[in-house]
Protein backbone atom coordinates (compact mmCIF):
# COMPACT_ATOMS: atom_id res chain seq x y z
CA UNK A 1 0.00 0.00 0.00
CA UNK A 2 1.52 3.40 -0.94
CA UNK A 3 2.36 5.98 1.69
CA UNK A 4 -0.20 8.63 2.49
CA UNK A 5 0.60 12.21 1.44
CA UNK A 6 2.64 14.31 3.87
CA UNK A 7 -0.35 16.59 4.51
CA UNK A 8 -1.89 13.74 6.53
CA UNK A 9 0.96 13.89 9.06
CA UNK A 10 2.16 17.53 8.91
CA UNK A 11 0.21 18.82 11.94
CA UNK A 12 0.91 17.68 15.50
CA UNK A 13 -2.06 15.93 17.10
CA UNK A 14 -1.76 14.42 20.55
CA UNK A 15 1.29 13.39 22.54
CA UNK A 16 4.38 11.87 20.90
CA UNK A 17 4.25 8.11 20.34
CA UNK A 18 7.86 7.06 20.91
CA UNK A 19 8.09 4.09 23.29
CA UNK A 20 9.39 1.31 21.06
CA UNK A 21 9.17 -1.31 23.79
CA UNK A 22 5.37 -1.01 23.62
CA UNK A 23 5.09 -0.65 19.83
CA UNK A 24 5.15 -3.89 17.86
CA UNK A 25 6.35 -3.40 14.30
CA UNK A 26 7.70 0.13 14.73
CA UNK A 27 9.72 1.00 11.60
CA UNK A 28 13.45 1.61 11.88
CA UNK A 29 14.91 5.08 11.38
CA UNK A 30 15.96 5.15 7.72
CA UNK A 31 18.48 7.97 7.93
CA UNK A 32 21.97 6.42 7.70
CA UNK A 33 24.06 9.51 8.57
CA UNK A 34 23.39 12.64 10.56
CA UNK A 35 26.87 14.20 10.05
CA UNK A 36 28.28 14.83 6.55
CA UNK A 37 31.36 16.52 5.13
CA UNK A 38 34.37 17.13 7.37
CA UNK A 39 33.53 15.72 10.79
CA UNK A 40 36.89 15.99 12.58
CA UNK A 41 37.09 18.78 15.15
CA UNK A 42 40.55 19.87 13.99
CA UNK A 43 39.38 20.46 10.41
CA UNK A 44 36.14 22.12 11.56
CA UNK A 45 38.14 24.72 13.49
CA UNK A 46 38.96 26.40 10.15
CA UNK A 47 35.28 27.08 9.42
CA UNK A 48 34.28 30.59 10.50
CA UNK A 49 30.64 30.80 9.36
CA UNK A 50 27.48 28.93 10.34
CA UNK A 51 24.22 28.60 8.40
CA UNK A 52 21.08 27.11 9.92
CA UNK A 53 17.80 25.97 8.43
CA UNK A 54 15.26 26.99 11.09
CA UNK A 55 11.61 25.91 11.36
CA UNK A 56 9.06 28.73 11.39
CA UNK A 57 6.03 26.65 12.39
CA UNK A 58 5.28 23.75 14.69
CA UNK A 59 4.86 20.50 12.79
CA UNK A 60 6.01 17.01 11.92
CA UNK A 61 8.53 16.08 9.24
CA UNK A 62 8.51 12.49 8.01
CA UNK A 63 11.82 10.64 7.88
CA UNK A 64 11.54 10.28 4.09
CA UNK A 65 11.42 14.08 3.74
CA UNK A 66 14.38 14.50 6.12
CA UNK A 67 16.40 11.94 4.16
CA UNK A 68 15.55 13.57 0.82
CA UNK A 69 16.57 16.98 2.17
CA UNK A 70 19.78 15.55 3.63
CA UNK A 71 20.73 13.84 0.38
CA UNK A 72 20.08 16.80 -1.90
CA UNK A 73 21.93 19.30 0.30
CA UNK A 74 24.88 16.96 0.86
CA UNK A 75 25.21 16.16 -2.85
CA UNK A 76 25.04 19.83 -3.81
CA UNK A 77 27.68 20.82 -1.26
CA UNK A 78 29.97 17.93 -2.23
CA UNK A 79 29.73 18.86 -5.91
CA UNK A 80 30.25 22.62 -5.61
CA UNK A 81 32.17 23.08 -2.35
CA UNK A 82 33.97 19.75 -1.82
CA UNK A 83 33.78 17.33 1.10
CA UNK A 84 36.67 18.96 2.94
CA UNK A 85 35.12 22.45 2.92
CA UNK A 86 31.90 22.01 4.91
CA UNK A 87 30.31 20.25 7.87
CA UNK A 88 26.58 19.47 7.61
CA UNK A 89 24.51 18.12 10.48
CA UNK A 90 20.89 16.97 10.49
CA UNK A 91 19.76 18.23 13.88
CA UNK A 92 16.40 16.48 14.34
CA UNK A 93 15.72 12.77 14.83
CA UNK A 94 12.44 11.09 13.79
CA UNK A 95 11.46 9.50 17.12
CA UNK A 96 7.67 9.85 16.76
CA UNK A 97 5.99 6.73 15.32
CA UNK A 98 3.20 7.56 12.87
CA UNK A 99 0.06 5.42 12.88
CA UNK A 100 -2.33 4.67 10.06
CA UNK A 101 -5.80 3.16 10.18
CA UNK A 102 -5.77 1.36 6.84
CA UNK A 103 -9.03 1.42 4.94
CA UNK A 104 -9.90 -0.82 2.02
CA UNK A 105 -9.87 0.84 -1.37
CA UNK A 106 -10.94 -1.49 -4.16
CA UNK A 107 -11.53 -0.99 -7.83
CA UNK A 108 -15.20 -0.50 -8.56
CA UNK A 109 -16.09 0.26 -4.96
CA UNK A 110 -19.52 1.86 -5.13
CA UNK A 111 -19.87 2.19 -1.36
CA UNK A 112 -17.39 3.94 0.93
CA UNK A 113 -15.94 2.01 3.80
CA UNK A 114 -16.56 3.90 7.02
CA UNK A 115 -14.61 1.94 9.62
CA UNK A 116 -14.34 2.67 13.31
CA UNK A 117 -14.15 6.29 14.45
CA UNK A 118 -10.88 7.41 16.10
CA UNK A 119 -9.27 4.02 15.46
CA UNK A 120 -5.76 3.70 16.90
CA UNK A 121 -4.03 2.41 13.76
CA UNK A 122 -0.84 0.44 13.16
CA UNK A 123 2.71 1.83 12.77
CA UNK A 124 3.22 3.33 9.31
CA UNK A 125 6.38 5.45 9.56
CA UNK A 126 8.33 7.91 11.66
CA UNK A 127 8.46 11.67 11.96
CA UNK A 128 10.45 14.34 13.76
CA UNK A 129 8.48 16.91 15.72
CA UNK A 130 9.80 20.45 15.39
CA UNK A 131 8.93 23.70 17.15
CA UNK A 132 9.25 27.26 15.82
CA UNK A 133 12.87 28.39 16.00
CA UNK A 134 14.26 24.85 16.13
CA UNK A 135 17.33 24.18 13.96
CA UNK A 136 16.74 21.42 11.38
CA UNK A 137 20.03 21.61 9.43
CA UNK A 138 23.30 23.13 10.63
CA UNK A 139 26.23 23.90 8.26
CA UNK A 140 29.74 25.13 9.13
CA UNK A 141 31.75 26.56 6.22
CA UNK A 142 34.23 29.19 5.03
CA UNK A 143 32.89 32.63 3.98
CA UNK A 144 33.77 32.16 0.29
CA UNK A 145 31.21 29.31 0.02
CA UNK A 146 28.24 31.30 1.36
CA UNK A 147 26.25 31.33 -1.91
CA UNK A 148 26.55 27.55 -2.38
CA UNK A 149 25.61 26.82 1.24
CA UNK A 150 22.50 29.02 0.99
CA UNK A 151 21.49 27.28 -2.25
CA UNK A 152 21.98 23.84 -0.64
CA UNK A 153 19.78 24.82 2.31
CA UNK A 154 17.18 26.32 -0.05
CA UNK A 155 17.02 23.00 -1.90
CA UNK A 156 16.73 21.11 1.38
CA UNK A 157 13.90 23.41 2.48
CA UNK A 158 11.95 22.58 -0.69
CA UNK A 159 11.72 18.95 0.49
CA UNK A 160 10.23 19.83 3.89
CA UNK A 161 6.48 20.22 4.59
CA UNK A 162 6.77 23.23 6.93
CA UNK A 163 7.98 26.78 6.23
CA UNK A 164 11.61 27.45 7.11
CA UNK A 165 14.15 30.26 7.00
CA UNK A 166 17.93 30.33 6.52
CA UNK A 167 19.99 32.06 9.22
CA UNK A 168 23.67 32.87 8.54
CA UNK A 169 25.97 34.05 11.32
CA UNK A 170 29.63 33.93 12.36
CA UNK A 171 30.64 30.76 14.18
CA UNK A 172 30.55 31.10 17.97
CA UNK A 173 33.45 30.20 20.20
CA UNK A 174 33.30 26.47 20.91
CA UNK A 175 29.57 26.11 20.29
CA UNK A 176 28.34 23.17 18.24
CA UNK A 177 24.97 22.60 16.58
CA UNK A 178 22.47 24.32 18.86
Curated annotation (Swiss-Prot):
Q: Which InterPro entries match?
A: Ribosomal_uL16 (IPR047873), Ribosomal_uL16_arc (IPR022981), Ribosomal_uL16_CS_euk_arc (IPR018255), Ribosomal_uL16_dom (IPR016180), Ribosomal_uL16_euk_arch (IPR001197), Ribosomal_uL16_sf (IPR036920)
Which GO cellular component does the record give, naming just one?
Answer: ribonucleoprotein complex
Q: List UniProt keywords, sorted A-Z.
A: Ribonucleoprotein, Ribosomal protein
State any GO BP term from the record.
Answer: translation
- The transmembrane residues are none
Spell out the molecular function terms from Gene Ontology: structural constituent of ribosome
Please name the SUPFAM superfamilies in this protein's record: Ribosomal protein L16p/L10e
- Please give the PANTHER family that the UniProt record associates with this protein: 60S RIBOSOMAL PROTEIN L10
Family that this chain belongs to: Belongs to the universal ribosomal protein uL16 family.
UniProt-recorded name of the protein: Large ribosomal subunit protein uL16
Task: Record the organism.
Answer: Pyrobaculum calidifontis (strain DSM 21063 / JCM 11548 / VA1)
Amino acid sequence: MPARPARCYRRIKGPPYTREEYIHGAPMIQIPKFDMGTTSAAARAAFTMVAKLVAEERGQIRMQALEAARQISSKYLTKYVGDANYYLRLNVVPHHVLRENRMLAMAGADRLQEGMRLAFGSPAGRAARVEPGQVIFYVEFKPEHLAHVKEALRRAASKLPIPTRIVVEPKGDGKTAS
